[in-house]
Amino acid sequence: MAIQLPGFTMKNPLMPASGTFGFGEGYAKEYDLNLLGALVTKSTTLAPRIGNQGTIFADGPDSTLNAVGLKNPGSDVVLHEKLPWLATQYPDLPIIASIAGVDVAEYAAVAKKLSAAPNVKALEVNISCPNVKQGGMAFGTDPEVAAAVTRAVKAASSVPIFVKLTPNVTDITAIAKAVEQAGADGLSLINTFVGMRLDIATGKPLLDNVTGGVSGPALLPMALHMVYQVAHAVRVPLIGMGGISSGHDAAEMLAAGATALAVGSANYYQKRAIPKIAAELAAIQEGQTVL
């Protein structure tokens, strides 16, 4: 089922969520990345970031907690190495470059730089990372600040922009409306919830960062609700994500109002998660029974 989004067409509605897929190199050893509808890169900042140190992952029975901290090689490496590799290996695969920054100026600078790459069809503006001390989620919890980032990126970018929303707000529709009015061509939602786990023997947090972003199947009901709310509040297309791990989950997210879908932590548990979900979704849409 082909999907039309601003700036490009996807052969199917599924893509990896930013941060869970790197730049595709590892997963390219597992399957043909042309099976994806699009590929969303790891969030990139102007300069390299080493991310958070120490323990950055903690798994639960139905969720994963991470505090990676936007670790990335920086915009120069992405522009001159990562994106050209994708263009050479997968010339027909639409690339959505995820960008982040510590201030509005950095967002704009990265947007201008990466949107110039020939295979980048859109940008995803990450204003919702909960694991960094500067920037990140701070930009996504205030409608005026979120709108300011959106306007700056829109002015700097030569491709459509999708703003990635945080669920860690009282009213996600207020943020959605603000960034839509500021020029967003689409929205991605939801990013992770802030959470923590503790070692009951010591009483100390499992993560050195204390808190992290909660993802995984446990998020699906909340993600569906927020996508449903936003779909009824804005007119731009939505990339829905949060807890998708099966074709049934994907079908629910589309029913909630998403135009396209991103799969995150399921990639950690099963390398071929996206092709599996795509096949299950196609079967459901064709009226077949999926076990």
Swiss-Prot record:
InterPro entries: Aldolase_TIM, DHO_dehydrogenase, DHOD_1B, Dihydroorotate_DH_1, Dihydroorotate_DH_1_2, Dihydroorotate_DH_cat, Dihydroorotate_DH_CS, Dihydroorotate_DH_I. GO terms for cellular component: cytoplasm. PANTHER family: DIHYDROOROTATE DEHYDROGENASE (FUMARATE), DIHYDROOROTATE DEHYDROGENASE (QUINONE), MITOCHONDRIAL-RELATED. Transmembrane segments: none annotated. Binds 1 FMN per subunit. Its EC number is 1.3.98.1. FMN binds at residues 18, 42-43, 126, 164, 190, 216, 242-243, 264-265. Homodimer. It is found in: Cytoplasm. Belongs to the dihydroorotate dehydrogenase family. Type 1 subfamily. This is Dihydroorotate dehydrogenase A (fumarate). It comes from Lacticaseibacillus paracasei (strain ATCC 334 / BCRC 17002 / CCUG 31169 / CIP 107868 / KCTC 3260 / NRRL B-441). It is an enzyme of class 1 (oxidoreductase). The gene is pyrD. Catalyzes the conversion of dihydroorotate to orotate with fumarate as the electron acceptor. One of its GO terms (biological process) is 'de novo' pyrimidine nucleobase biosynthetic process.
